[in-house]
Design a protein with these regions (language model features):
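Aromatic- and glycine-rich beta-strand/loop motifs that create alpha-glucan
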Residues: 1-25
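Membrane-interfacial helix-loop-helix connectors in multipass membrane proteins
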Residues: 39-50, 114-135, 181-194
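Transmembrane helix boundary and interhelical loop/hinge segments in multi-pass membrane proteins
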Residues: 64-84
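Junction motif at the cytosolic side of a transmembrane helix
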Residues: 202-218
């Protein structure tokens, strides 16, 4: 646990010094969500119905913007080889990278999402579902995204390949995340969707770091 904490602190320091990836993700998230009503119309009855889905789709895309660089800097300067030989292990490194990615990107998306929900006239009774689904879902994006980042490390046009690999894996998160918001708007119970997202998160925590480590060893 001490090694994990030190690695998370290291990754947060690197992310904060770089800074631009997280900022670009949030700016993209806000701009893309703001642009959608111009394309689909501003019907007050329609916007709440599509708002949850749009926010989740844009969040998926925004979270992917910085995934390509998750391991790239360590690979380029040789740090990844040293970490591979260290007692900490690549699985712990992968978990630390995912946690740092979520803290610098996912948390910002989580904060911005309720503000954007106001743009879509999402009812106040659905805000809890929005926050809960994002709180459970966005860490999954970082954990699963780490697998794609490891598989495409050093590849030409890695960003395109990363999107092709990861987007299909994000679909269940999108379905249940947006479904929780729609259920809250319609007055239906949202516990089933949140429980499924919680199960996905536990599975990702258990499996994704080690799958990422296996990909890094190749």
């Amino acid at each position: 646990m001490i090694g994990l904490g030190l690695l998370i602190r290291r990754e947060l320091g690197l992310a904060l010094r770089g800074g631009t990836d997280a900022v670009m993700a949030v700016v993209f998230f806000v701009l893309a969500a703001v642009l959608f009503p111009f394309g689909v119309g501003t019907d007050p009855a329609m916007l709440p119905r599509i708002g949850g889905g749009i926010i989740w789709v844009v969040a998926l895309l925004a979270a992917m913007l910085s995934l390509e660089r998750m391991f790239a800097s360590d690979h380029e300067d040789g740090s990844l080889d040293l970490l591979y030989l260290s007692p900490v292990g690549l699985g712990t490194l992968a978990l630390a990278k995912a946690v740092a990615h979520w803290l610098t990107t996912g948390v910002l998306l989580l904060i911005a999402a309720p503000i954007l929900a106001l743009l879509y006239n999402v009812p106040a009774n659905a805000f809890g579902a929005l926050v809960a689904s994002m709180l459970l879902g966005t860490p999954i994006l970082s954990l699963v995204g780490g697998i794609g980042a490891a598989l495409t490390l050093g590849a030409r046009r890695g960003g395109v390949l990363l999107a092709l690999l990861i987007l299909p894996l994000y679909i269940p998160v999108l379905i249940f995340g947006a479904g929780a918001i729609d259920g809250a708007i319609a007055g239906r119970p949202i516990a089933p969707q949140l429980m499924v997202l919680g199960g996905f998160l536990l599975a990702a925590l258990a499996l994704a770091p080690w799958a990422t480590a296996a990909a890094l060893r190749q």
